[in-house]
């Protein structure tokens, strides 16, 4: 999971908002992470569709309907169920909490 590694991100965090509130950029990152994870989980279906398309060329759509439907079903299963997106959001929130804890420890050790 690729995140913004800017150490100032936590210090710039708006203290009036709870840390679990995601910025639009963080929400976009959660959705991007979900897409990546979904394609990993459905890799066999995606590969089957790609192989069928490669083998059939211009006849891909009538010939590969079964593979397309299986791939679509798998991808939509993960992308439409909110618990998977919530899981990606939780990962980002946990990362923000960890960064904040490290920052607090660093500040307390310098005092």
Curated annotation (Swiss-Prot):
Name of the protein in its database record: COX assembly mitochondrial protein
Function comment: Required for mitochondrial cytochrome c oxidase (COX) assembly and respiration. Binds copper. May be involved in copper trafficking and distribution to mitochondrial COX and SOD1.
* Pfam families, alphabetized: Cmc1
Query: Where does motif Cx9C motif 2 map?
Result: 64-74
Major location (coarse):
mitochondrion
Q: How does it sit in the membrane?
A: Peripheral membrane protein
Describe the family membership recorded for this protein in Swiss-Prot or TrEMBL: Belongs to the CMC family.
Drop me one GO molecular function for this one. metal ion binding
Q: Where is this motif: Cx9C motif 1?
A: 42-52
Q: Where in the cell is it found?
A: Mitochondrion inner membrane
Write out the GO cellular component annotations. Answer: mitochondrial inner membrane
Q: Do you know which InterPro entries this protein is assigned to? A: Cyt_c_biogenesis_Cmc1-like
According to its UniProt entry, this protein's organism is Saccharomyces cerevisiae (strain RM11-1a) (Baker's yeast)
Alphabetically sorted, this entry's keywords are: Chaperone, Copper, Disulfide bond, Membrane, Metal-binding, Mitochondrion, Mitochondrion inner membrane
**Residue span(s) of domain CHCH:** 39-82
What gene name is given for the protein in this entry?
CMC1
Disulfide feature: 42-74, 52-64
Instruction: Provide the taxonomic classification.
Output: Eukaryota, Fungi, Dikarya, Ascomycota, Saccharomycotina
């Amino acid at each position: 999971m690729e995140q913004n590694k800017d150490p100032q991100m936590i210090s710039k965090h708006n203290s009036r908002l709870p840390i679990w509130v995601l910025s639009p950029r963080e929400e976009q990152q959660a959705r991007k992470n979900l897409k990546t994870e979904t394609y990993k989980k459905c890799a066999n279906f995606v590969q089957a569709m790609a192989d069928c398309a490669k083998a059939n060329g211009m006849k891909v759509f009538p010939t590969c309907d079964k593979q397309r439907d299986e791939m679509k079903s798998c991808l939509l299963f993960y992308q439409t169920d909110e618990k998977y997106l919530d899981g990606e959001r939780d990962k980002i929130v946990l990362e923000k909490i960890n960064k904040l804890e490290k920052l607090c420890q660093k500040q307390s050790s310098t005092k």
